[in-house]
Amino acid sequence: MRQGKMYRVKNLAKNVRNDCMGVINHGPYQRAPHARLETLDSSWKAPVKDTLRDGDVVACVGVDKFVTDHYESQPFYKVLTLKGHVAYVSKGNRNKYFELVRD
């Protein structure tokens, strides 16, 4: 992901359970206090109200590095959703669930 570019969510419909994405502010793999954009099961009733589905667009607003449970800094891409939430996307989720809207 590059700063200032728009990205479309893709491939979520192929998942059996985790068929949407939402901003998560908690979790077991969190070493730094930052919100993450993670896949979610849409049937799970959670405090996450706004979810992203295939075709939704986010904007990349930067890249930061955070120490993960692997004890090394990993790049996390800071994105802005259409609802105004700012969250971080891991490199693995970036490759699997996002595509550049256009160059």
Can you describe what each PLM-predicted range is?
Residues 14, 23, 39-42, 54, ...:
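Generic detector of low-complexity/intrinsically disordered segments
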Residues 10-12, 61, 80, 101:
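A structural detector for beta-sheet-dominated domains
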Residues 2-22, 32-41, 47:
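Short coil-to-beta transition motif at edge beta-strands of beta-rich domains
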Residues 27-29, 34-68:
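Conserved beta-strand/loop element in small beta-rich adapter and peptidoglycan-binding domains
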Residues 92-101:
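Structured surface patches comprising rigid loops and adjacent beta-strands/short helices at the edges
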Residues 53-92:
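SH3/SH3-like beta-barrel superfamily modules
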